[in-house]
Design a protein with these regions (language model features):
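Short strand-turn motif at the edge of the Rossmann-like AdoMet-binding core
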Residues: 119-120, 203, 227-228
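Core alpha/beta nucleotide-donor-binding catalytic domains of modification enzymes
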Residues: 128, 133-160
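A short helix->loop->beta-strand "cap" motif at the edges of active sites that frequently abuts
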Residues: 112, 218-221
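S-adenosyl-L-methionine
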Residues: 1-138, 173-178, 246-282
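Conserved beta-strand signature within the Rossmann-like core of class I S-adenosyl-L-methionine
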Residues: 220-228
C-alpha cells in the first residue's frame, strides 16, 4: 500500500483534518480504495507495505464485529502521520491501550523506544506474535491497564468487540456478552513522567486518569488521545484549563480548544492533543 503521498498530504494539510471537511472525505475514500486492494484483507497474505513506514506483516483477524482492516482508518493514519512528522522530536514514547500492537509497530518504524500497555491477555498473545514477525526491537510490552493508581482492578472484555474492552466502571451499560477478570493497573503519572510522548486510547478511563495528574506532570510530555463521552470531554476540558495544559482538537483542524464545543466527545469526532506548549508541532 503506497500511502506515502497520503501521509505527506496529511502532514502538510493538518488544518484540514476535521471529519466534516472535503479534504477528509476525499482522503478517506482514497484510503478505502487502497485498503480494498491491500494484502491485509481476509484471504490475503497479510504482508503489505504501508509507506513510508515500510513492509508490515499484519494478518487479517476478527475481534468480534471489528477486524484488523478497521485499524487502518483515516483517523489512525492521521495519528501515524503525526508520529512520522515528529520522529526527530521524541525519543521515548508510550502506547496506552495498545490492542494488538499496530500503533506500537508504526512507532517502532519511526525509531522511537516504545513502552506499550495492554491488559487483555488475548490481545497480548497476538501483539507478541506481531512484534516477532515484524522484527520490532524497540517495543517493551506491559500486560497492564492504565488508570489513576497502580494496583489491580476488574477488566471487562466485550466479546462482540474486544477493541472496546475496558476497566470496570469506565463505561456505562457495556453491551453484549461480557467476561470479567482481574488485571494489573499502572498509574498514568508513572508513564507521563518517563516518556516524551504518549498515545492513549483507554476506553472511557481517560478522565479518571487525567484527573490524577498535575501541572508538573505535563512539563516534558505530550499526548494524543481518544475521548469517549461528552461527560469525559467536559471533565477533561475543565480540569486541564485549571492546571494550564493546552488542548488541540482534530475536529477544529488541530486549533487550540477555547470552549467545550471544540472538544471531541467520541471517536467519531477525532482525537485530542495535550501539551504545555502553545502549538501542536507538525
Amino acid at each position: 500500500m503506497n500511502t506515502s503521498i497520503l501521509i505527506d498530504s496529511l502532514i502538510k494539510n493538518h488544518s484540514m483534518h476535521s471529519r466534516e471537511s472535503n479534504f477528509y472525505k476525499e482522503h478517506e475514500e482514497s484510503l478505502r480504495q487502497m485498503l480494498e486492494m491491500s494484502d491485509f484483507n481476509d484471504g490475503k497474505s497479510g504482508k503489505d507495505s504501508i509507506m513510508p513506514f515500510g513492509n508490515l506483516d499484519f494478518p487479517y483477524r476478527e475481534m468480534g464485529a471489528i477486524n484488523t482492516i478497521h485499524l487502518f482508518g483515516l483517523d489512525e493514519l492521521i495519528i501515524f502521520s503525526y508520529y512520522w512528522a515528529n520522529k526527530s522530536r521524541y525519543k521515548k514514547v508510550a502506547d496506552l491501550g495498545a490492542n494488538i500492537g499496530l500503533h506500537s509497530m508504526i512507532m517502532d518504524r519511526c525509531g522511537y523506544s516504545i513502552n506499550s500497555y495492554e491488559p487483555d491477555p488475548m490481545h497480548i498473545k497476538i501483539f507478541n506474535e506481531n512484534v516477532k514477525n515484524n522484527n520490532c526491537s524497540n517495543i517493551s510490552i506491559n500486560q497492564k491497564a492504565i488508570s489513576d493508581q497502580t494496583g489491580t482492578m476488574d477488566f471487562i472484555r466485550v466479546l462482540g468487540n474486544t477493541t472496546g474492552s475496558h476497566l470496570a466502571g469506565a463505561k456505562e451499560d457495556p453491551y453484549g456478552e461480557l467476561e470479567t477478570f482481574s488485571v494489573e493497573t499502572v498509574s498514568i503519572n508513572e508513564v507521563l513522567l518517563n516518556n516524551d510522548f504518549v498515545k492513549m486510547d483507554i476506553e472511557g478511563q481517560e478522565a479518571t486518569a487525567i484527573l490524577s495528574t498535575n501541572s508538573d506532570t505535563w512539563s516534558n510530555v505530550e499526548m494524543i488521545l481518544e475521548v469517549g463521552t461528552s461527560k469525559n470531554a467536559e471533565t477533561i476540558f475543565n480540569y486541564l484549563n485549571q492546571i494550564n495544559v493546552n488542548m488541540f482538537s482534530q475536529k477544529i483542524g488541530w486549533s487550540k480548544v477555547s470552549s467545550i464545543s471544540d472538544m471531541p466527545i467520541s471517536y467519531k469526532e477525532g482525537s485530542l492533543f495535550l501539551t504545555k506548549a502553545d502549538l501542536m508541532k507538525w
